[in-house]
Amino acid sequence: MKIIWIDGTFGIGKSAVAATIVKKIPQAHLLEFDALQEKYKPTSDSDRFGKRYPEAKKYLVDALVDEITEIIQEGGCNCLVIPVALINDYCNQKLIDGFANIESHHFILTAKTEILHQRINNQENRDIRFGSNLYARGNTVFK
C-alpha cells in the first residue's frame, strides 16, 4: 500500500491530477477531500466557520484520517490517491506524520497567480472571493 498526496492551493488542479493518476495505476483508489466535506456538511455555526476557514477544519481532517484508516484496513487497493491542501501543521501532523509507516509520495502543485485567478473565476460552485483573496496569495513555488 502507498499513499500519493496531491497538495496545492485552491484552484490549482489537485482533483484533475489525482483523477489522471488513478486511471494510470491499477487498483488505485481516489479519496476526494471535497467529497468528504460534502459528507460532513456543517450542522452548526462552528462547523460552518470550519468549512469557510481552513484553520478551523480539524474535524474534517480527523474524518479524513478515519476514512484513510478504514480503506487501509479493508484492503483491496494498492494505492490511495488523495488530493488535499495540507495547509497547516495540524494537517501535516495528522495526515503525513500519522501515516509515516506507509510508503508515501507528496506532490505540491504550483501555478502562476494569474492562472490561479483565471481558474478560480471560471469554477462553478466555489467560493470565488475566498479562493482569490486567500489561497492565490498563498501560492508558494518551491525551487
How should each PLM-predicted stretch be described?
Residues 6:
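Hydrophobic anchor at the beta1->P-loop junction of P-loop NTPases
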Residues 9:
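P-loop (Walker A) phosphate-binding loop of NTP-binding proteins
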Residues 12:
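ATP-binding Walker
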Residues 15:
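Walker A/P-loop
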Residues 18-66:
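Conserved substrate/cofactor phosphate-moiety recognition/catalytic segment
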Residues 56-101:
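Glycine-rich phosphate-binding loop used to anchor ATP phosphates in small-molecule kinases
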Residues 100-121:
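Conserved phosphate-donor/acceptor-positioning beta-strand/loop module used by diverse small-molecule
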Residues 122-143:
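Small-molecule kinase domains that catalyze NTP-dependent phosphoryl transfer to phosphate-bearing small molecules
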